[in-house]
Structure formats: structure tokens, C-alpha cells
């Protein structure tokens, strides 16, 4: 009888504010990153941190969504994975960070993508999804180490909301899950949470 090969289940780390700031500072200071790639990474890290979007969902965003977030505090995005609409919200801090990353004048084409291909003149052209995901994840791993991916933003946001005793149904709705059980699987206490919970 053949034995099933055991595989290690690696720890998936969460990205909290500490890791987010580390990513932003590193990218801003890295002179080897081309300006357009730097802009895409900074935008991606910020939007993922505040919304918990998936990278492929982020690539669907247009400048019109950013304008709505800044003016109204919310916007709706159609998610291709679930074929459903997700409402994104922007508080004061998120708006402040968006204003640092987007130049929005009245002449700006609101149909331009948030994440764009640098080699193309039209900012309506997006980057190949697989290429962008690989680029973002390799940069995250380079800065934070193994165990971190773009999905760590999503997990970190859900975990922080759970730690603040926010109702799981509210977290599920905020993050765009159709099932609360999915949201529960994401809640992953940080080392600090575990240390703080020690009773002996």
C-alpha cells in the first residue's frame, strides 16, 4: 500500500498597518522600480489595504470609481469572479491616501484604469492579470518575506475587523463574500493576538 506524501501546511501571514507602511515606504524609496510600476504598486497596496479587494477585482477599477469614493465615500464594482456587485467604502484616511496617488482634474478620462500598462499610451489598457499578480506577489515576498501574498491584505482586514468584535455578517458583506463561512475561514489571529490571549 502506497503512503500518501505529507505536505507542510505553510502559515499564511496577514498584512496589517505595520506591513502596509513597510511596503509603501520600500516601494517609494526603491529607485530601481520604474515610475509607472511604482505608481501601480502604490495604488494596489493602498486599495487592497483599505478594501480587501482581490487583485483581479482591483484591475477592473476605473478612475470613475476613485472619483465616487472621494466625492461620495462609496462606489460599486461588478466582480467577475462572483458575478455580483460589491460596494466599496472610503473613510477619511482612505480618501487622504487616494488623493496622494491620483491626479484628478476635470480633463482626466474617468474611464482610464486605476492599474495601467506603462508601455501603452492609452490608460484604458490594463495589464495582463497573471503578469500583474506575479509582479505584486513577488514584490510583497521580496519586502515582507515568504508567507505573504496579495491575499494577505484581505486576510489582514478580515482578521482586524474580527478582533474588533465586528459582526461576521457585516465583515462578510464588507469584504464581498456570499457565505459567512468563507469569512470565518479568513480570520487568522496575529502573533500579538495569540500572545495577548495567553492565560499562563
Residue ranges and their predicted role:
Residues 4-24, 83-93, 108-111:
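DNA breakage-rejoining catalytic core of tyrosine-based enzymes
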Residues 47-60, 164-166, 177:
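A short, glycine-centered helix-capping/turn motif at helix boundaries
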Residues 66-68, 166-185:
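Short, polar N-cap/turn motifs at the start of nucleic acid-interacting alpha helices
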Residues 60-96:
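Conserved tyrosine-mediated DNA breakage-rejoining catalytic core shared by Y-recombinases
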Residues 17-51, 55:
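Basic, Lys/Arg- and aromatic-enriched nucleic-acid-binding interface segment
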Residues 27-35, 133-173:
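Short, basic (Lys/Arg/His-rich) helix/loop patches that form interaction surfaces
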